[in-house]
From Swiss-Prot:
GO terms for biological process: DNA-templated transcription. SMART domains: RPOLA_N (SM00663). Signal peptide: none annotated. Its EC number is 2.7.7.6. Zn(2+) 2 binds at C97, C100, C132. Zn(2+) 1 binds at C57, C60, C67, H70. Mg(2+) binds at D493, D495, D497. InterPro entries: DNA-dir_RpoC_beta_prime (IPR045867), RNA_pol_asu (IPR000722), RNA_pol_N (IPR006592), RNA_pol_Rpb1_1 (IPR007080), RNA_pol_Rpb1_3 (IPR007066), RNA_pol_Rpb1_3_sf (IPR042102), RNA_pol_Rpb1_4 (IPR007083), RNA_pol_Rpb1_5 (IPR007081). This is Probable DNA-directed RNA polymerase II subunit RPB1 homolog. One of its GO terms (molecular function) is DNA-directed RNA polymerase activity. It comes from the Viruses. Gene3D superfamilies: 1.10.132.30, 1.10.150.390, 2.40.40.20, 6.10.250.2940, 6.20.50.80, RNA polymerase ii (3.30.1490.180), RNA polymerase II, clamp domain (4.10.860.120), RNA polymerase Rpb1, domain 3 (1.10.274.100). Belongs to the RNA polymerase beta' chain family.
Length: 1377
């Protein structure tokens, strides 16, 4: 029998439980022995495949590389319940009568609506059933103990009986229970035939002494042995041996032997599948055996490590470093690495000669001949014959000189003589070079060359921009090197970081890297629309210095100016640009400079008078910008017609310029802009020089007394606040705020005491490195050290200065820290390191949760956002369908372009008197391309109109404010239409993964960077934000801190009115107002009788009451919450049979309580009185008062409480009252309010770090079912099998999938990767539609264009249609799955 494999995509995979018949059909042999030497088929039968080189499989006649392996089998002497489904089998048996094999209750009595939970509902219903409704037989109680089904007496049940029961269950009952009778019949849950894995899944390891079996083989051997011991032949021999023995009593009976081996068989089969509890161990070493579950599940298992792993050939890894001479899209690759990595190239008639020359010049490593495509020829062994092998110490005589061999790779030359051990070798073979001739159809694997594109990756791969393509530049170095401007998305800092490169192996992959993933085409981030590219460190310092030069002041020599100008690549024509600079300067500064006469000398050189005006930093910077680029922002920067007029270039300003240049001119111009900045500033700093020394750390001596006095004043103020504040929590908060304010004031003093030329100030002001906080720590003081937002705990014994004992450091790094200060600083720094180590795993796991849950969400050709299951999440991505990396914010709205900038640039060529505003008809005509193009199945017409309004309104608002001329109207419309289609998110884009990565990367990087600000309040803020981020994603039902903001409608929202409403909100019980209580004799004092006469109080007579309870109340609590004595009195008297009287004296708030209470029960009675309700809402532990700056009114912030309770209050402001508990919002206001709350909370946590479109998609994904879902494994239960398996609980999901007979059509991302298919996302979502008539037409009519010189050139026909003219047939061939 021969096996001819066919390579084809798998259409679908159906899961189920194999029946004995299917196992036998699948098996290729019956295993009868465990010994290799025995006759018959053993555990390593060649019918199951081979694992030895040179041997072929007896089933498929394939070698070790091509044989897929085949299963074997053996028959079990006793049926064994499959340990995977033992609980399901037990539950099914509880529902079946053992007498009549019917369902124990009538089906008509059950009303089951939920098919997903059908089996669970049935189990709950039959739990209390005692008899079968059909035959009235008693139900047998069953349970599972140690992977064995037992009865109520804990005795194992006969599996033959269990199998007989399940075999007699009819298919209708099986379907009713929720199982598939064909794919997962319950009878298949019991093994009668056991499958044996092929040897390739459990290969042995050969050593010099013996052969070591795999753990699975070891288990199979034990299973087969115990199964053979249960056979009749073995039991008969055991019984015969027992009878022949003289001491029969010393040998166990046959039944005991059978039970022993049966128990061992159950144990071995159970641990064969799952040995996670490490029960099964090797007899010799006691090492736990690895089961199937341990092989498959876990991070290092077969699923995540192999099937979903990213390890591949043609990749390299080494340390990465910076190279300022590289362009933005270039990557320096070590020559040694480039000679190893290869790219396959097919030989054609057009490139045969060139590839032949390449091969014969040692630029290719392997050759695959068309005649034998399975064999790869190593060209290094074929082309270069090295000749005689040289040894270390050999001596080569060449032209009268002697060369001692220290490198055995030394190349001999004809005429060389080899002297070895003092004697000359007689036979010497000199190197030969063989010429290779290529044929059409061959494939060569050439070495990496300059200009090739490779994929660069740094781990952890947190987001899309962690993998980008670069153009290779090969250099004789040992490390990878990249441009510093592209380090931001990789987050690499060159402190030993390593990066990976992946070489594309197909033309399609090369095209995608070049056109889609290239660094120069990924300028803007899809995460938040901000630049991925950023000028950093030295270049920023150079820009800062150059931009501070003033016009009309020559700061550069003529030679220096022109030398620096030569570093700018692709610069404009010098004379034209110089004339333009002079023209702009003359119009802006007519009173400055000498503008008379020509600006050029007789020989065409720049005249000295012009040189004195423009030979400076701003003159150089003017050559960087496009000739028509304008910018005038609130940062003081002014650029007109590309001429840098005024302002200072620092980090944020440069990032803004990069974004505007990208939107106005595209990625090519902005890439050249970034490259030229670095080339210019690098050469400028080489001439100028820049360094930081000890003198930069020294502050002005006059500032030291100010810092000391400021510190003392801060301590005095904090002491005053501590003494007057009663609440310890508020006291600590106020103290910490005062101490932190001291640091803020010292930061200002530090900046003032250093000159503007101080190199520390230069680095901070330019944005190159550090901040004013770092300067303050170096020169002034370190300030208060905090851990988790709290002050450091002090020592046990009292100190002279309480604040310094609690972590306030009054010294700077220059002055040095005292031992106590050093300890506190180390404590805070240690916390930062711990957070980085521990919280990184938490945030990383959160990112993986988001990616796995959203990996199948993508944009379809109708621009709806759906997943492979067809579930609709958004009608259009982000409510407008825009790509965040292509949008820009204008007038507070996200739109396609800045019309103001565009019009200003276009209007420059026209007289301002000819400008006019646009009419409404013109505006409507200019935006008519934004309209519903088709009526799609998923988008209702009213929603489509709303989408159009969202897209149109920001553009229309800008068009109404501009002025232009008639000639520019069609040009303006054409540009708007182009921007619109460029800004749309492309169909096929995996917006689910992009959004999850964007939010995950933000939280992970925030955690990683906490140690940079160790000891400051920023560290605690990041930790709290991460905790809140988890609560929102996981929809925690009991958040850590439930807070509510309560607003009232009546009144003007003053603090006095809010305080009066405090007692209606805070839950106050009698215990809260009691300071202490005592039991005293019931002496009849004079005010008792007066009180009885005035109020007719039911005070017991003195003869019946001998004791009274006197409560001393907390005056501050009673007055703070406006609690009247009458309220306390009514609360106690309404609940207990007591009388309450308040003392009329000013000695304090004293409440006497009388009642008919036995003296020995007084203490227990007081314990019952203390929890008595006084006022407020239940669950509200504390309240505080705050002012809303937006509404300019005060509100109450509570700890605890629910919206439903607040809505019962009078005058409650329902619109603004809110809570941070998403479940409370959902139960009170519904799912839409919960969605908006989720968006609002995520925006507050993340800020502008992630685009709002990604946040909305996350909220829609977790609320689209109408209920709140969490970002956990429980939400994954509704996904396809392979999606669930690729996340968590791998084996458990496999078990459930097989039990429920699920089918996966392999359209998901995880399923496609596991099965070796292309995931239908991105470019793989579509196929290329070819015009075969044009391709196959005869040469006379072939689509070749004849040029003027008579030559021909092939062209690709392009349809000259606009998007409005596309017909519906354009989407016919798209695969929407």
């Amino acid at each position: 029998m021969t096996f001819q494999p066919e390579i084809a995509d798998i259409a679908k995979i159906s899961f189920g439980v194999l029946s004995p018949e299917e196992i036998l059909k699948m098996s290729c042999c019956k295993v009868t022995s465990v010994k290799v030497s025995d006759k018959g088929e053993n555990i390593y039968s060649k019918f199951m495949g081979t694992i030895e080189n040179g041997e072929n499989c007896k089933t498929c006649d394939r070698d070790v590389w091509e044989c897929p392996g085949h299963f074997g089998h053996f028959h079990l002497e006793v049926p064994v319940v499959n340990p995977i489904f033992i609980n399901d089998a037990c539950n099914i048996l509880r529902c079946i009568c053992f007498n009549c094999y019917k369902f124990i209750v009538s089906v008509d009595h059950l009303k089951l609506e939920n098919l997903v939970r059908r089996f669970q509902d049935i189990l709950l219903y039959v739990k209390n059933i005692k008899h079968c409704y059909n035959c009235e037989s008693e139900k047998l109680p069953l349970s599972v103990v140690n992977e064995i089904i037992v009865d109520e007496d804990k005795n194992p049940l006969d599996t033959r009986k269990l199998l007989r029961v399940l075999e007699n269950v009819d298919d209708e009952t099986v379907r009713f229970l929720g199982f598939n009778p064909t794919m997962s019949h319950p009878k298949n849950f019991i093994f009668t035939v056991f499958p044996i894995l092929p040897p390739c899944c459990r290969p042995y390891v050969m050593s010099e002494e013996n052969c070591c079996d795999d753990d699975l083989t070891y288990q199979l051997i034990e299973i087969i042995k115990n199964n053979q011991y249960l056979g009749d032949e073995f039991l008969k021999k055991a019984e015969l041996k027992r009878k022949k023995s003289l001491l029969q009593s010393s040998l166990p009976p046959t039944t005991d032997i059978k039970q022993k081996h049966l128990t061992n068989l159950w144990f071995r089969i159970s641990t064969y599948f799952n040995n996670s509890k490490k029960k099964a161990k090797h007899a010799a070493t006691a090492k736990p055996i690895t089961g199937l579950k341990e092989r498959i599940a876990g991070k290092e298992g077969q699923i995540r490590h192999n099937l979903l792993g990213k390890r591949c050939d043609q990749s390299g890894r080494t340390v990465v470093g910076p190279d300022p001479t590289l362009r933005l899209n270039e990557l320096c690759v070590p020559k040694e690495m480039a000679e190893i990595l290869t790219i396959p190239v097919h030989v054609t008639p057009f490139n045969r000669d060139a590839l032949t020359q390449l091969v014969n010049s040692n630029k290719a490593n392997f050759l695959i001949k068309a005649a034998n495509p399975k064999r790869s020829i190593n060209l290094k062994n074929v082309i270069n014959y090295r000749g005689t092998l040289l040894y270390f110490g050999d001596i080569i005589e060449r032209d009268g000189t002697r060369i001692t061999i220290t490198d055995t790779k030394f190349v001999l030359q004809p005429g060389d003589t080899i002297i070895r051990n003092g004697k000359a070798l007689k036979e010497i073979r000199y190197p030969e070079r063989k010429q290779i001739e290529l044929e059409v159809g061959d494939v060569i694997k050439r070495q990496l060359m300059d200009g090739d594109y490779v994929l660069l990756n740094r781990q952890p791969t947190l987001h899309k921009a962690s993998m980008m393509a670069f153009k290779v530049v090969i250099k004789p170095v040992k490390t990878l090197k990249i441009n510093l401007a592209i380090t931001k998305p990789f987050n690499c800092d060159f402190d030993g970081d390593e990066m990976n490169i992946h070489v594309p192996q197909s033309y399609e992959a090369i095209a995608e890297l070049k056109e889609l993933s290239c660094a120069s085409k990924c300028i803007m981030s899809v995460q938040n629309g901000k630049p991925n590219v950023a000028i950093v460190q030295d270049s920023l310092i150079g820009l800062w210095f150059l931009s501070r030069d003033q016009w009309f002041c020559q700061t550069l020599k003529r030679s220096q100016f022109f030398n620096l100008l030569l570093t700018i690549d692709k610069a404009q024509n010098f004379l034209t640009r110089m004339d333009q600079i002079c023209h702009v300067l003359k119009s802006k500064f007519p009173s400055k400079g000498n503008w008379e006469g020509s600006g050029l000398d007789g020989d065409g050189r720049v005249s000295p008078k012009v040189g004195r005006m423009v030979f400076n930093g701003r003159g150089l910077l003017s050559f960087l910008f496009p000739y028509d680029f304008d910018y005038c922002g609130g940062d003081g920067l002014s650029i007109e017609s590309g001429v840098f007029l005024e302002g200072t270039l620092e980090k944020n300003v440069v990032n803004t310029l990069i974004k505007y240049i990208y939107k106005d001119y595209g990625e090519t111009v902005v890439a050249d802009f970034v490259d030229n900045i670095q080339f210019l500033t690098n050469h400028y700093l080489v001439d100028r020089g820049f360094t930081i020394n000890a003198s930069d750390c020294l502050k002005n001596e006059s500032i030291a007394p100010e810092i000391v006095s400021l510190t003392r004043a801060t301590f005095s103020k904090a002491t005053t606040v501590r003494d007057v504040t009663i609440n310890p929590f508020i006291q600590e908060q106020k103290t910490l705020a005062i101490l932190n304010s001291c640091t803020d004031q010292c930061m200002k003093l530090s900046k003032e005491c250093l000159s503007s030329d101080n190199n520390f100030c230069v680095t901070t002001e330019s944005g190159s490195k550090g901040s004013i906080f770092n300067i303050c720590q170096i020169t002034s003081l370190l300030g208060q050290q905090t851990i988790d937002g709290k002050r450091v705990y002090g020592l046990l014994h009292p100190q002279d200065n309480e604040f310094q004992d609690r972590g306030f450091i009054a010294n700077s790094f220059v002055e040095g820290l005292s031992p106590r200060e050093f300890l506190h600083h180390a404590m805070a720094g240690r916390k930062g390191v711990i957070d980085t180590a521990l919280l990184t795993s938490v945030s990383g796991y959160g990112q993986r949760q988001g990616v796995k849950l959203n990996e199948d969400i993508k944009i379809y050709p109708d621009y709806t956002v759906r997943d492979v299951n067809g579930r609709l999440y958004q009608y259009i991505f982000g409510e407008a369908g825009y790509d965040p990396s292509q949008t820009i914010v204008v007038d507070g709205h996200q739109t396609i372009c800045n019309v103001y900038r565009l019009v200003n640039r276009l209007n420059r060529s026209y007289d301002s008197s000819a400008l006019r505003p646009l009419t409404e008809d013109e505006i409507e005509w200019m935006v008519d391309f934004i309209q519903p193009r088709r009526e799609y199945e998923y988008i209702p017409p009213d929603v489509e109109q709303r989408i159009c309004s969202i897209r149109r309104d920001p553009i229309v608002g800008q068009l109404r404010r501009i002025q232009t001329v008639d000639a520019l109207v069609p040009i303006l419309k054409s540009h708007l239409e182009k921007c619109f289609y460029q800004t749309l998110m492309s169909p096929g884009e995996c917006v689910g993964i992009i959004g999850a990565q964007s939010m995950g990367e933000f939280s992970t990087q925030a955690t990683l960077n906490t140690f940079h600000v160790a000891g400051s309040t920023t560290t605690g803020a990041v930790t709290n934000c991460l905790t809140r981020f988890q609560e929102i994603n996981n929809a925690t039902k009991n958040p850590k801190n439930i807070t509510c903001k309560v607003y009232f409608t009546k009144g003007n929202g003053t603090i006095e009115e809010i305080r009066r409403r405090g007692k209606d909100v805070k839950h106050i019980v009698f215990r809260d107002v009691v300071e202490k209580w005592t039991v005293e004799p019931a002496t009849a004092e004079w005010w008792y009788a007066t009180f009885k006469q005035l109020y007719a109080a039911p005070i017991a007579e003195s003869g019946t009451v001998t004791k009274r309870v006197r409560f001393h109340l907390k005056r501050d609590i009673v007055f703070a919450y406006r609690i009247s004595p009458q309220e306390i009195k009514q609360s106690l008297e309404s609940k207990f049979d007591v009388s309450c009287i308040f003392s009329p004296f000013d000695e304090g708030l004293i409440l006497d309580v009388f009642g008919k209470i036995e003296p020995h029960k007084l203490e227990a009675f007081v314990a019952l009185m203390l929890p008595t309700y006084i006022s407020g809402l239940e669950g509200i532990k504390a309240i505080s008062y705050h002012k809303c700056d937006e509404l300019k009114i005060w509100y109450i912030q509570t700890s605890g409480g629910t919206l439903s309770d607040f809505y019962t209050l009078d005058d409650i402001d329902v619109e603004h009252t809110t809570t941070n508990n998403i479940w409370d919002i959902y139960h009170t206001l519904g799912i839409e309010a919960a969605r908006e709350f989720r968006i609002k909370e995520l925006v507050e946590i993340i800020g502008t770090g992630v685009d709002l479109s990604h946040i909305k998609l996350r909220a829609d994904r977790l609320t689209f079912t109408g209920t709140i879902q969490s970002l956990t494994r429980y939400t994954m239960r509704g996904e396809k099998p392979f999606s669930k398996v690729g996340f968590e609980e791998i084996m458990e999901n496999f078990y459930k999938t097989a039990r429920d007979a699920e089918v996966d059509d392999l359209t998901g991302v995880s399923a496609s990767i596991m099965c070796g298919k292309r995931a239908k996302v991105g470019t793989s979502m579509f196929d290329i539609k070819l015009n075969l008539d044009a391709i196959l037409c005869p040469p006379s009519t072939s689509p070749l264009l004849t040029t003027e010189d008579g030559t021909t050139s092939a062209t690709t026909p392009i349809a000259a249609t606009t998007p409005e003219q596309e017909d519906d047939e354009a989407f016919v061939d798209y695969d929407y799955t």
